[in-house]
């Protein structure tokens, strides 16, 4: 159950980061309201706070988080951008998630 909680925390963290970057992107690239910067900043603050909730060392958290970020970003590609990930996207996500699992759940202290 710890693994599921860890993965879900990484996924929520990734959503906060992606939303925090996407909202300024809308303002800069699609001429949307500058008011989008306010929730964008809030999302990035939430992202930073969520990273502190992970119990591992910061560098290990960032490394493992990267794998989940890739998978969540592909979900965003499909849900928000309307582009369905292809088999290569999915293969890449599987590799990064495998790396995340090794980093996050390896038995530390074992030889």
From Swiss-Prot:
It is found in: Cell inner membrane. GO terms for cellular component: plasma membrane. It is a multi-pass membrane protein. The chain crosses the membrane at residues 7-27, 33-53, 63-83, 90-110. InterPro entries: UPF0060. Keywords: Cell inner membrane, Cell membrane, Membrane, Transmembrane, Transmembrane helix. SUPFAM superfamilies: Multidrug resistance efflux transporter EmrE. Signal peptide: none annotated. Belongs to the UPF0060 family. This is UPF0060 membrane protein Aave_2845.
């Amino acid at each position: 159950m710890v693994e599921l909680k860890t993965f879900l925390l990484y996924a929520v963290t990734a959503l906060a980061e992606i939303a925090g970057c996407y909202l300024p992107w809308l303002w800069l690239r699609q001429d949307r309201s500058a008011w989008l910067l306010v929730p964008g900043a809030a999302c990035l603050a939430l992202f930073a706070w969520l990273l502190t909730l992970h119990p591992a060392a910061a560098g290990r958290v960032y490394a493992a988080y990267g794998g989940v970020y890739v998978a969540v970003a592909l979900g965003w590609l499909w849900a928000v951008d309307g582009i369905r990930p292809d088999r290569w996207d999915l293969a890449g996500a599987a590799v990064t998630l495998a790396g995340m699992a090794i980093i996050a759940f390896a038995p530390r202290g074992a030889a």
